[in-house]
Amino acid sequence: MSTEPNCPFSGNARKHTAAGAPSNADWWPNQLKLNILHQHSAMSDPMGEAFNYAQEFKSLDLEAVKKDLLALMTNSQDWWPADFGHYGPLFIRMAWHSAGTYRVSDGRGGAGSGNQRFAPLNSWPDNVNLDKARRLLWPVKQKYGRKLSWADLMILAGNVALESMGFKTFGFAGGREDIWEPEEDVYWGSENTWLDDKRYSGDRDLENPLGAVQMGLIYVNPEGPNGNPDPIAAARDIRETFARMAMNDEETVALIAGGHTFGKTHGAGDVKHVGPEPEAAGIEEQGLGWNSGFGTGKGGDTISSGLEVTWSTTPTKWGNNYFDNLFGYEWELTTSPAGAQQWKPKGDAGAGTVPDAHDPSKRHAPAMLTTDLSLRLDPAYEKISRRFHENPDQLADAFARAWFKLTHRDMGPLSRYLGPLVPKEQLLWQDPIPAVDHKLVDEQDIAALKTRILASGLSISQLVTTAWASAATFRGSDKRGGANGARIRLAPQKNWEVNQPAELAKVLQKLETIQKDFNSAQSGGKKVSLADLIVLGGCAAVEAAAKKAGQDVKVPFSPGRMDASQEQTDVDSFAVLEPAADGFRNYARKGLEGSAAELLVDKAQLMTLTAPEMTVLIGGLRALNANVGQSKHGVFTKQPETLTNDFFVNLLDMSTKWQKSATSEGVLEGRDRATGELKWTGTIVDLVFGSNSQLRALAEVYACSDSQKSFVRDFVAAWNKVMNLDRFDLA
């Protein structure tokens, strides 16, 4: 038998990792997906660590960009001709589909990162031919380079498209930074077939956190639920999916009517003529997909959704003709040339009133989607639609505001908005916080306040738990939540089970007394906000706990938070931030105990934590006795409220044998191997740091005999990160 290596250029060349060997996830599909904690690092980012997009964007001549985009709108290209001689409707669809993936439940999706450039979104069935829209934008992106992200450009192009067709938009903010690899943390559904809908159970109950009815769609099936052309049933789907994007009925009607004022859908022929999506297309396609063999494959022969609908007689001009047509005709079911279910005026009504997108010698009748008929046949939608029809100015205002909300919902607070086009009006969904209007506390004040807090009778665990509860609502997905605003004292957060309302009220009462006493004793307008005081209390407690462990540390603290009012807090909007589980506080709602480890990783990802940061925080918070309800699960120490590495030392102690509790779901018992004596109890969240090989490797670092100092150092750094997650003013 020959031992000579195969020639690397022969057909028997060895395969390498990039050729697609089975991954660990293929072998063990149920293992924790810790990779979601290490996305978008400097290793995948070509811009360099010194790159500051906000500064680059501020130097951008936005009016020049808009001028270039305006010229592009009517500069039709032979390789992808513009419908009606205008690319505006295509760019509106691109921007809408970039933003429309947002779901309020976990804040993921949305337009904030330019993720439409990558799989799976770039290849979703609902995004057919949006690859062409981005290629049309490439000369603009190429011209302005690092000053203008793809994420901002896609939304700006949608705005300019609307303005170029006579619509006045509400405004535009830049500040969206591009990612450079696909997102691994977003759960788009369990289906492995496009347009499948295993996400439903019971009486059409849509799985959380999903915001679309089928795999690969943005919202709903335009033909109706599973292709059933029932406008009333479709209205139910519309209402559910738009609500999951934080839109009410009026905003929903405005968005559908406003968007469908422009452009058309494409179903010139059978979809069997359409080639594979971009991620499956051949290398010669250079990232484009859906190459069609029907006729020319473009222009009048374009196939996208399979539906062939033009709603308005003026598809490149803002107006009220969408509602004129919706209410002006009686509608009957028909099929597109591709066989898709759609609606036409009964008889020959409306014939010749709608222009052809590419042949000026042809005219057509208007058409509607099943989901358009929902706006006429659903009683609540109809009432709004008729009001908009009779009051076009109300439609224009509602659409402008809803479009702005759609395209900016995941950008976070107003302080992150960049550029001269940011509207002055502050909106409730932006979670407003008052601007700093007083002199901030200095180092001497901070030291005095710490002393007062620690002498107040509040325990280390009370102070730590309250600060954590205030800060840990932050979501990096849509930049909501966090300690700024002190909304933990307001509804709904003050009533959340995880925040232990009765205990929280006691802590807040004492902190408010300290705040009042301090502020009343000051001159020159100096004040401390309760938001700052809550965080400072946690920092003081961490320092005290470290001192008990024999280490003097100074936990960083940056004043400047302000206190929001109840009027500035939308209770329903903030309700979605309530955690079903918070493994850092060893909390999970009943029934979720078995998936607590996965929920911990999900929360850590939303808080932008790495696996090492998550690990050290768990160990520290257990030592600080910060569990909900003062539960002893995972408090593997004989000296609670002392910042030691005991959690890791005792978790990895081989003299302890672990077994599942016979009486408590999700709880394990650690017993002495020799005597059987019960030593500790822990949850799945605690024990996963010993069972998962990657987390055990991290736990071992902090369990070593020389790791106490590094443990405290790393805990303080991670704690400081969490306390400042929403301090965009410090960046």
From Swiss-Prot:
This is Catalase-peroxidase. The lineage of its organism: Bacteria, Pseudomonadati, Pseudomonadota, Betaproteobacteria, Burkholderiales. HAMAP family: Catal_peroxid. GO terms for cellular component: cytosol. The active site is at H97. It comes from Polaromonas sp. (strain JS666 / ATCC BAA-500). The gene is katG. Gene3D superfamilies: 1.10.520.10, Peroxidase, domain 2. Heme b binds at H260. The keyword Electron transport does not apply. One of its GO terms (molecular function) is metal ion binding. Bifunctional enzyme with both catalase and broad-spectrum peroxidase activity. The record marks R93 as: Transition state stabilizer.
